[in-house]
Each structure stands twice: as C-alpha cells, then as structure tokens.
C-alpha cells in the first residue's frame, strides 16, 4: 500500500482491499474513494494526463467554460464513479499495488521529487494489468492543492510534468 500521512483509513479497509486484489488477478493497482474531512468527495480518479488536460485543470477555476468541461472529463465526472471501474491515473495519496508489479516496474521513479510521480507509476503499472477505482472502500484525505499557492512548488510541478511528458 502507498499512503500519505494525511490519510485516515475507514473500517479496516486494508485487508479488504488486499482481498479484492487477490480475487481480481487482472487488476494490479487500485485506489479507494477519498473524501475531504468535511465529507465532500475528492475527484481523484483521472484519465491519463495530457498537456491540454493539465492546463485545463489549472485554468478551470478561473476561466470555466471549455476549461471546466476538459477538467470534468479529466477527473472522470462524465463517468459513473459509484461502481468499481478501470481508471488511467491512480492517486499516490492512497493506492494498493501488487508487490510483484511494484518491483517489476521499479517502484517510483527517483527523478520525480514530487508531483506527477503517481501518474508515472500508474502508466507503468497499466503495462502490467488494470488499474481500478474501488468506491466501496473509503478513506479521508486532508488534501491541499499547494502548487497553486506556492511559486516554488508550482515550478517543481512544472519540472515533473516536463519529465513525465518526455518519457
């Protein structure tokens, strides 16, 4: 399991998620539905990042319109996320990944300090099998979008995105 320190696990889901993965051998990585501490859903299941979708993600809050529609597509708001389903980008804040797959793909790329490392890991895991959202399992994540508030972190995110798209 990959867990950020700001994740609160509900209902002893780790063994349940592990069993779900054992029961579904074609799935190599999965994430539960994450919620903010106030109970709102975090829209973390995503499609494969593209430069356009990441730009739209950053600009949607300010400009809406086509940027908002692209962001909703990127965050899969046009899909039924209440049932287990394949996804293309598994958040690194809480993910279950098969140990053999994690070892085969070499774990996290050490060239990423922060940001986009989870997208990279997901894309390499997808070469080994399916990646799933498991909304029947839930956790709370006290997530903050720091890059938009801190120029240094935003620069770090841009550097990571550049590396990701060069791969």
Write out the residue ranges for each language-model feature:
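Conserved donor NDP-sugar-binding/catalytic core segment of glycosyltransferases
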Residues: 10-44
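Short glycine- and hydrophobic/aromatic-rich loop-to-beta-strand nucleating segment
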Residues: 34, 73-76, 80, 88-100, ...
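Short, hinge-like loop/turn segments at secondary-structure boundaries
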Residues: 45-51, 150-152
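Catalytic donor-sugar/metal-binding loop of nucleotide-sugar-dependent glycosyltransferases
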Residues: 85-86, 95, 99-113, 119-140
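Active-site-adjacent helix/loop segment of glycosyltransferases
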Residues: 119-123, 127-167
């Amino acid at each position: 399991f990959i867990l950020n320190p700001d994740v609160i696990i509900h209902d002893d889901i780790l063994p349940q998620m592990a069993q779900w993965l054992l029961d579904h051998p074609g799935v190599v990585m999965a994430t539960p539905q994450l919620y903010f501490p106030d109970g709102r859903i975090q829209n973390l299941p995503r499609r494969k990042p593209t430069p356009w979708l990441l730009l739209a993600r950053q600009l949607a809050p300010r400009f809406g319109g086509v940027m908002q529609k692209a962001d909703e597509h990127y965050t899969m708001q046009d899909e039924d996320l209440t049932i287990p389903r394949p996804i293309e980008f598994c958040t690194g804040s809480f993910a279950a990944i098969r140990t053999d797959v994690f070892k085969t793909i070499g774990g996290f790329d050490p060239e990423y300090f922060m940001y986009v490392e989870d997208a990279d890991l997901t894309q390499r895991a997808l070469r080994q099998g399916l990646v799933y959202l498991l909304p029947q399992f839930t956790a709370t994540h006290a997530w903050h979008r720091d890059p938009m508030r801190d120029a240094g972190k935003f620069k770090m995110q841009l550097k990571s995105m550049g590396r990701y798209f060069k791969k």
